């Protein structure tokens, strides 16, 4: 039963893929270890017309079925990034519950996937992908099946009383705002060239959205492309903020206050050689000066603490390596996944493959005794 439910969810996930590609993947999954390994190799070498998210998902499914399939760095990096915000205690707790589940039916009692946060779900997926031999086949299949069920539920026609067209329109608006944000980041940080490149990509995506908005064929592909841009824009924004903290700190410390300057500042209100116009008396001026100095000192201390935290994260916790990897995948990808996905979306639009039927809103049938019905 577990294997059949996984196949059904995989087929539902691939509903927007070209029919021959979908058939080839399903045939590989049902054809045994040798067929699955061959298909995983084709996916890894990008010989199948799949978008980046589809490719990594299918590789995760195949490795969960057959641990002999070697992990793919692209899929591992995606999982690491998705779980980077998860607390260590939460990760330990999730792993303990997974091992205690025992069998396929036991996954339901500890999962309740719809109540889980995305990073908790991805922690489970990462566990069965990175350490498949630590879990029984039923636990691996149950985890991946539930993950696919969540992804398929999120792609239903209506969700939270907002139509798919309405959600896409909101996302297009976010793309335009991202383009403006990248323009601002290019002007204030040292990430100018990369920010401008990402801005051009967001503008191109916005133009493509305007031309294809309302197309049932293009809607899921546009949403995936927009989601990819959102992640890259978010990473660029975080890098820009870290860059600004360093710049502001060194701008302030480049001109430290001397004792003489401090004395001059404190006695500024007693200066009778210059004509000044103000509405403060002597005591008020003295207090305002002290308050300004106090705020300046607090700001300096805050920035210094931020610098120390970043140094600790880099040298002690080893997070700089992961951050550098994020920078590489964000601004220097080996293959621009977004452009590749957009090109594939255009190809699918031209071929007119697998257009959803507006009159058919019935869900894809699944077994009534499936354990993940909540």
Swiss-Prot record:
Swiss-Prot/TrEMBL keywords: Disulfide bond, Glycoprotein, Host cell membrane, Host endoplasmic reticulum, Host membrane, Ion channel, Ion transport, Lipoprotein, Membrane, Palmitate, Phosphoprotein, Signal-anchor, Transmembrane, Transmembrane helix, Transport, Viral ion channel, Viral matrix protein, Virion
Record function comment: Ion channel, which might have a role in genome packaging and uncoating processes.
Residue numbers on the Extracellular membrane side: 260-288
Subunit field text: Homodimer; disulfide-linked. Homotetramer; disulfide-linked.
GO biological process: monoatomic ion transmembrane transport
UniProt topological domain (Cytoplasmic) ranges: 1-238, 310-374
Assigned protein family: Belongs to the influenza C protein M1 family.
Keyword Disulfide bond among UniProt keywords: yes
Name the record gives this protein: Polyprotein p42
Modified residues annotated as Phosphoserine in this record: 337, 362
């Amino acid at each position: 039963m577990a294997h059949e439910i996984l196949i059904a969810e995989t087929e539902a996930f691939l509903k927007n893929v070209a029919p021959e590609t979908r058939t080839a993947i399903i045939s590989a999954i049902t054809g045994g270890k040798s067929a699955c390994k061959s298909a995983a190799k084709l996916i890894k070498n990008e010989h199948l017309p799949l978008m980046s998210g589809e490719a990594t998902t299918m590789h995760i499914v195949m490795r969960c079925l057959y641990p002999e399939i070697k992990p793919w760095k692209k899929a591992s990096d995606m999982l690491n990034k998705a779980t980077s915000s998860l607390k260590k205690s939460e990760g330990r707790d999730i792993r303990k519950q997974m091992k205690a589940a025992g069998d396929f039916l036991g996954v339901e009692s500890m999962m309740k996937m719809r109540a889980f946060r995305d990073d908790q779900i991805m922690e489970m997926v990462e566990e069965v992908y990175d350490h498949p031999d630590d879990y029984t086949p039923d636990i691996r299949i149950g985890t991946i099946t539930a993950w696919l069920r969540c992804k398929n539920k999120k792609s239903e026609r209506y969700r939270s009383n907002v139509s798919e067209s309405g959600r896409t329109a909101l996302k297009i608006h976010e793309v335009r705002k991202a383009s403006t944000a990248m323009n601002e980041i290019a002007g204030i940080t040292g990430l100018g060239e990369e920010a401008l490149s990402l801005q051009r990509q967001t503008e191109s995506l916005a133009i493509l959205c305007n031309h294809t908005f309302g197309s049932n064929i293009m809607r899921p592909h546009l949403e995936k492309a927009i989601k990819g841009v959102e992640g890259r824009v978010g990473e660029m924004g975080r890098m820009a903020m870290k860059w600004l903290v360093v710049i502001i700190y060194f701008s302030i410390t480049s001109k430290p206050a001397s004792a003489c300057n401090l004395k001059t500042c404190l006695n500024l209100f007693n200066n009778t050689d210059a004509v000044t116009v103000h509405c403060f008396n002597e005591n008020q001026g003295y207090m305002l000066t002290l308050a300004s100095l106090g705020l300046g000192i607090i700001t300096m201390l805050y920035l210094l603490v931020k610098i120390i935290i970043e140094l600790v994260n880099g040298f002690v916790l080893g997070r700089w390596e992961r951050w550098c990897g994020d920078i590489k995948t964000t601004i220097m990808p080996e293959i621009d996944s977004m452009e590749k996905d957009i090109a594939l979306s255009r190809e699918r639009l031209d071929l007119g493959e697998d257009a959803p039927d507006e009159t058919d809103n019935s869900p894809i049938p699944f077994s009534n005794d499936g354990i993940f019905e909540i």
